From Swiss-Prot:
It comes from Macaca mulatta. The chain crosses the membrane at residues 52-72, 95-115, 121-141, 149-169. Phosphorylation at Ser-209 is necessary and sufficient for the direct interaction of the phosphorylated FFAT motif with the MSP domain of MOSPD2, VAPA and VAPB and allows the tethering of two membranes that participates in the formation of ER-endosome contacts. Phosphorylation of the FFAT motif leads to conformation changes. Additional phosphorylations around the core FFAT motif (QFYSPPE) are not essential but strengthen the interaction with MOSPD2, VAPA and VAPB. GO terms for biological process: cholesterol transport; progesterone biosynthetic process; vesicle tethering to endoplasmic reticulum. Pfam families: MENTAL (PF10457), START (PF01852). A motif (FFAT) lies at residues 206-212, 207-212. Residues 248-443 form the START domain. This is StAR-related lipid transfer protein 3. Present in retina. Localizes to all neurons of macular retina and especially cone inner segments and axons (at protein level). The gene is STARD3. GO terms for cellular component: endoplasmic reticulum membrane; endoplasmic reticulum-endosome membrane contact site; late endosome membrane; mitochondrion; nucleoplasm.
Length: 445
């Protein structure tokens, strides 16, 4: 397949709006459903990175305690040494104050960052300042250096641990939690803003909006349509999951300035990554295609079962259930990757399809379905929020932008670097096969 010339690729990019600019215009008409926002009890829960910090603070106390106990366990016995260290305390020769200093850090940091869950650095600034000043004075004035290896070891270890805690909080905990809070507030703002142009997503596709259905109405929201139909509790859960995935995909598209470049290829395809709160690292493929958006919509979104005919990264795709006009359950089997080091995986996803004025969107997330229980033949992967987005060009209807958002857990004991390499390679391979398919359809026409 011949690749796009560089000038044509640049022209395509100039003629197509950026994802973020689109997200700030018409996509704002799609208000985020309230289930995008974590429930209050989840918002109050301590974050994973803060929990790790608290564990490290606990390790600080336990490690200093262990070293002190080893120092006490000499020929004269622990009990006698404890009397000398505590009852007959001497600043110049005792290690007891270093243990008390570790307990001071432990109690202060856990009170501030585990119990009160403070978002400021002042508590650790106090504990680190007190620890550093005390240890420096003790090393200068005491006679610990005459007590052998422990005279060097305990002050140094205590000093290093105190500053490691400072680094961890300042460079890991607070920035990551601030980023999660920014995402949460952005989602809240989108919910409060409400629909500006038209409510709900329209489904006008041939496969999912029959003439007699309610999905073709411009004046009816998804909730009103659902109210006119009878859904089971499980079907309502599928619909909720699909809407949640769509809301997260909209947020990712609106955060294009925060996408981190990973790699590109000679065809102009680019892979980015972004850390999504509560879902982790997400891969994003962005490519420009010399064809109408409707063509990609038909081939990739409306006809997933036929994708196996041209997409070599997928070996099977089956629609298990059509819940309603916008929502369906699919079963997919991926081909192996990384030269066979990553074996085929199977996935059960709920998909939500929306047709908007500026784009076509198919978003999905992992779910469970009785028609496809776990099997020994494949390792069952689990997809986070993601999907396909086909962006229309406002100035040139013969070109479009294709975005694939992929958040997946392949399960199994696979090295992280191997997973990341295989996902990026799979995305490039998919883009290659998609271009081939477009060329074949163009030749037939």
């Amino acid at each position: 397949m011949s690749k796009l010339p560089g000038e044509l690729a640049r022209d395509l990019e100039c003629s197509l709006p950026a994802v973020a600019s689109l997200g700030s215009s018409l996509s704002h008409s799609q208000s985020l459903s309230s289930h995008l926002l974590p429930p209050p009890e989840k918002r109050r829960a301590i974050s994973d990175v803060r929990r790790t910090f608290c564990l490290f603070v606990t390790f600080d106390l336990l490690f200093i305690s262990l070293l002190w106990i080893i120092e006490l366990n000499t020929n004269t016995g622990i009990r006698k040494n404890l009397e000398q260290e505590i009852i007959q305390y001497n600043f110049k020769t005792s290690f007891f104050d270093i243990f008390v200093l570790a307990f001071f850090r432990f109690s202060g940091l856990l009170l501030g960052y585990a119990v009160l869950r403070l978002q400021h650095w002042w508590v650790i600034a106090v504990t680190t300042l007190v620890s550093s000043a005390f240890l420096i004075v003790k090393v200068i004035l005491s006679e610990l250096l005459s007590k052998g290896a422990f005279g060097y070891l305990l002050p140094i270890v205590s000093f290093v641990l105190a500053w490691l805690e400072t680094w961890f909080l300042d460079f890991k905990v607070l920035p990551q939690e601030a980023e999660e809070e920014r995402w949460y507030l952005a989602a809240q703002a989108a919910v409060a803003r409400g629909p500006l142009l038209f409510s709900g997503a329209l489904s006008e596709g041939q496969f999912y909006s029959p003439p007699e259905s309610f999905a073709g109405s411009d004046n009816e929201s998804d909730e009103e349509v659902a109210g006119k139909k009878s859904f089971s509790a499980q079907e309502r859960e599928y619909i909720r999951q699909g809407k949640e995935a769509t809301a997260v995909v909209d947020q990712i598209l609106a955060q294009e300035e925060n996408w981190k470049f990973e790699k590109n290829n000679e065809y102009g395809d680019t892979v980015y990554t972004i850390e999504v709160p509560f879902h982790g690292k997400t891969f994003i493929l962005k490519t420009f295609l010399p064809c109408p958006a409707e063509l990609v919509y038909q081939e990739v979104i409306l006809q997933p079962e036929r994708m196996v005919l041209w997409n070599k990264t997928v070996t099977a795709c089956q629609i298990l259930q059509r819940v309603e006009d916008n929502t369906l359950i699919s079963y997919d089997v991926s081909a192996g990757a990384a030269g066979g080091m990553v074996s085929p995986r199977d996935f059960v996803n709920v998909r939500r399809i929306e047709r908007r004025r500026d784009r076509y969107l198919s978003s999905g997330i992992a779910t469970a379905h009785s028609a496809k229980p776990l099997t020994h033949k494949y390792v069952r992967g689990e997809n986070g929020p993601g999907g396909f987005v086909v962006l229309k060009s406002a100035s040139n209807p013969c070109v479009c932008t294709f975005v694939w958002i992929l958040n997946t857990d392949l399960k199994g004991r696979l090295p992280r670097y191997l997973i990341h390499q295989s996902l990026a390679a799979t995305m490039f391979e998919f883009a290659f096969h998609l271009r081939q398919r477009i060329s074949e359809l163009g030749a037939r026409a």
